[in-house]
C-alpha cells in the first residue's frame, strides 16, 4: 500500500475532503497552524469584533443607546410641555405665559380738577418766604446760600399743593433793603392753558426777597 501510486483524480478528491491535510503537507514539521491557516476559506470578518458587528456596521454604542428618535448630539427630546412661540420659560421648564405690558397712562392735558391754581400757590409761597426770613439779616457773603435755602423751602411747600404731573421751577432774588427800587422781571415759554406761576415778595428790616415759581405741566 505504501509504494502503490494513487491516481491523480483520486488524489485531488482526497485533498478536497480534508483541506487540513493539504495545509499540513505544505507546513514544515514541528510548527503549529495559525488561526488564519485553520479558518475555512470564504468571505467573513478578520476579527472577533468584526464577526459581531459586521463589516458594514458603522454605529457606535452611544448611537445605539440614543435610539432613532434622538436629537442632535445623541440627546433624547424632552417629554415636558412645549410652550407656544413667544412665551417665557421658567427655570423648571414650565411656561410662564406672555409678559403683561401696562397700558400707557400719559395724558396730553391735565385731568379735570388737576390744573394749576395760581392763588393757592401764591399763598403757600408767601408762607414759605415768611418762615424762612423771619429773623434773617442780609450778609453779602451768605446771600447765595440763603437764596438756595429759600428755593428749596418754597419747592417743598408747593409740592404738597401742586397737582400731579407738574414740574416746579423756582427762582429767588435776594438783596439788602436800603430804600432803593427794584424791578424783577420773569419770562417763560409755556402753555397758557395748562401752565401757571406764583410770585411773592417778603421784606424785613434788613433785606427783601422776590420768589417766582413756574408750574409746568410735563408728560
UniProtKB/Swiss-Prot annotation:
It holds the Pfam family Tctex-1. Transmembrane segments: none annotated. Residues 10-20 have a biased composition (Basic and acidic residues). GO terms for molecular function: dynein intermediate chain binding. One of its GO terms (biological process) is microtubule-based movement. Residues 1-84 are annotated as: Disordered. The keyword Ion transport does not apply. Signal peptide: none annotated. It comes from the Eukaryota. GO terms for cellular component: acrosomal vesicle; axoneme; cytoplasm; cytoplasmic dynein complex; microtubule organizing center; motile cilium; nucleus. The modification Phosphoserine is found at residue 64. Keywords: Cell projection, Cilium, Cytoplasm, Cytoplasmic vesicle, Cytoskeleton, Flagellum, Nucleus, Phosphoprotein. It is found in: Cell projection, Cilium, Flagellum; Cytoplasmic vesicle, Secretory vesicle, Acrosome; Cytoplasm, Cytoskeleton, Cilium axoneme; Cytoplasm. Belongs to the dynein light chain Tctex-type family. Interacts with ENG/endoglin, TGFBR2 and TGFBR3. Interacts with PPP1CC. This is Dynein light chain Tctex-type 4. The gene is DYNLT4.
Amino acid at each position: 500500500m505504501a509504494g502503490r501510486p494513487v491516481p491523480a483524480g483520486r488524489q485531488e478528491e482526497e485533498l478536497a475532503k480534508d483541506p487540513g491535510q493539504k495545509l499540513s503537507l505544505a507546513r514544515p514539521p514541528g510548527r503549529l497552524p495559525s488561526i488564519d491557516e485553520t479558518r475555512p476559506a470564504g468571505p467573513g470578518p478578520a476579527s472577533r469584533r468584526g464577526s459581531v458587528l459586521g463589516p458594514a456596521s458603522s454605529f457606535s454604542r452611544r448611537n445605539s443607546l440614543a435610539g432613532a428618535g434622538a436629537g442632535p448630539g445623541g440627546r433624547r427630546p424632552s417629554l415636558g410641555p412645549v410652550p407656544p412661540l413667544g412665551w417665557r420659560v421658567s427655570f423648571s421648564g414650565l411656561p410662564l405665559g406672555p409678559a403683561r405690558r401696562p397700558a400707557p397712562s400719559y395724558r396730553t392735558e391735565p385731568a379735570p380738577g388737576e390744573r394749576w391754581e395760581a392763588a393757592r400757590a401764591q399763598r403757600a409761597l408767601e408762607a414759605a418766604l415768611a418762615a424762612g426770613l423771619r429773623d434773617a439779616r442780609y450778609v453779602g457773603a451768605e446771600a447765595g446760600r440763603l437764596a438756595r435755602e429759600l428755593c428749596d423751602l418754597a419747592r417743598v411747600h408747593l409740592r404738597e399743593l401742586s397737582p400731579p404731573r407738574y414740574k416746579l421751577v423756582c427762582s429767588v432774588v435776594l438783596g439788602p433793603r436800603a430804600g432803593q427800587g427794584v424791578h424783577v422781571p420773569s419770562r417763560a415759554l409755556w402753555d397758557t392753558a395748562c401752565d401757571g406761576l406764583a410770585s411773592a415778595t417778603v421784606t424785613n428790616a434788613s433785606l427783601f426777597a422776590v420768589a417766582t415759581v413756574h408750574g409746568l405741566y410735563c408728560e
